[in-house]
Amino acid sequence: MTQVSKTIAKPSGNANLYSRLFSYYRVYKKLIFIALAGLCLFSFVDAGMIYFVKPLIDQGLSKADSHTLQLGALLVVAIFFLRGIASFTSSYAIAYISSKVTYRIRQQAFDKLLYLPRTYFDLNSRGSLISKIIYDTEQLSQSFSSAVVIAIRESVIILVLFSMMVYNSWQLTAIFLVIVPIIALIINKVSKRFKNISHKLQNSMGQVSNKTEQAILNQQEIVLLDTRTQISAQFEKTNNNNRQQNMKLQATSAISNPVIQLIASFAIAAVLLLASIDQVLNQLTPGSFTLILIAMGSLLKPLKQLSNINQQLQKGLIAAKSLFSFLDQQEEHDIGTKQLSKTCSNIRFNNFSFTYQGKTQPALSNFSLQIKGGTSVAFVGESGSGKSTLARLLLRLYQSPKQSILINDIAIEDYSLSSLRAQFAFVSQDIVLIDDTLANNISFGCNRDVTDSEIEQAAINANVMAFAKELPLGLNSEIGENGRNLSGGQRQRIAIARAMLRDASIIVLDEATSALDNHSEKHIQQALTRLTQHKTVLIIAHKLSSIQHVDEIIVINKGRLIEQGNHKTLQAKAGYYQSLYQSQ
């Protein structure tokens, strides 16, 4: 992962937000210069065209000068040609810069997502995270790019128009200056409202994404439970909230523009009245008076555009705060330097307790256990007893107290994360499959380069070939998104083949066969037998009939180890384990 975000100062205010955002644009200095030059040229030409009204009226029409009109005809074509080149150059350069910045920030956000600790995902909805990467990145770049374009283009137009007005009549121009402080006051008031609404709009967009994602993920359950009406009503409420926030934003924008234009119209009316005074009227030619009126009317559009900058900036600032706060999140704690060797690892849990963040009830309490390398150990207990927590802590998905878990007499936090996890192969009910071939799914996540023959051998050992040979392209057949074309048992066998190829020293089986039929389970058990030979095996099981062969069974209840022994020993005790066994 490229840690670009770590080198940029954390934002503590709008000034720092702008500074941090500028760091993404800084690498495109030459393109920015070209874009700015194109914008300025476009604006200068666009506004400057009005100046030709004066000679065309005073010379071409009033004095019937055909040469002036002919020259004007040539200039119109030349001016629009120059205007077109400037428009294309600036638009393309700005679009290119904006797309590169969006790409870079989105990639950083996605990379950050991959390195965040598990606790972050427990406390934040998937919809809000998706919204950050898709919506916020686009909003951030587009808002600031749009604001910069408007600020430069319209400012140059205003400057050119204002200069022409002053040159032709400073008295009439002075009237227009009266409205500037009033417009500034309106913009300031509107800005505060934009900021508040933009924040609410962003949150509501995240809720829409979250509801949509949940509906897609749980589509089957929604249909089977016949809750479509209820889910639709919940989404309608969230969707309507998003619409209302958007309408508030649009209403604020819509009312600010007419107010600004109304104030400007009073200034134009005052100009017309002042121009009727003889002293002023005598100083004006028909061309200069027409030029001033056109210029004043033309000023309304850039003034209106400038008033909209706040809306763009506030959207961008809200997105920037959200994204930069996300990019500054602490990544997984990884300061270990030791390397875990590929041996039959001994594991020791040293009398520790663990509570998930945001919870008050401990998931594990005063837990102590020693597991000898090369043995198979099963953890049993009711749902929520703490079985899966042990596996998560071993893999350091969550941080256990220091020195509380040791592998080969070394605390797991002293190993580097990559070295630690390389020696674990994890097989569970929830199989992660990619939209690719069977072969690529088997080799997915392997920490070394593998050959086609190794993949095929793993497929044979995991009984994948039993169904792969029936597919048109065998192991090179596509399995569809998340393996939608496969059964549960077939998906499970791919996971086992993947674990075999990984060749780790510790195997974790998290209820790997609990949801399978007898035929599928037979194939899986055969594959698991091959997978777990000469390995340290940890089994998290609900189906107690599948663990009678293990070396040791650990019985957990409410986070505490209450019984320990093999199947026969625990049966003889007639305790908690026996009651669990009989209940099945």
UniProtKB/Swiss-Prot annotation:
It is an enzyme of class 7 (translocase). SMART domains: AAA (SM00382). CDD domains: ABC_6TM_MsbA_like (cd18552). The chain crosses the membrane at residues 32-52, 68-88, 146-166, 167-187, 254-274, 280-300. Residues 33-315 form the ABC transmembrane type-1 domain. Keywords: ATP-binding, Cell inner membrane, Cell membrane, Lipid transport, Membrane, Nucleotide-binding, Translocase, Transmembrane, Transmembrane helix, Transport. ATP binds at G381, E382, S383, G384, S385, G386, K387, S388. PROSITE patterns: ABC_TM1F, ABC_TRANSPORTER_1, ABC_TRANSPORTER_2, MSBA. Its EC number is 7.5.2.6. In MsbA the ATP-binding domain (NBD) and the transmembrane domain (TMD) are fused. Belongs to the ABC transporter superfamily. Lipid exporter (TC 3.A.1.106) family. PANTHER family: ATP-BINDING CASSETTE SUB-FAMILY B, ATP-DEPENDENT LIPID A-CORE FLIPPASE. This is ATP-dependent lipid A-core flippase 2. It comes from Colwellia psychrerythraea (strain 34H / ATCC BAA-681).
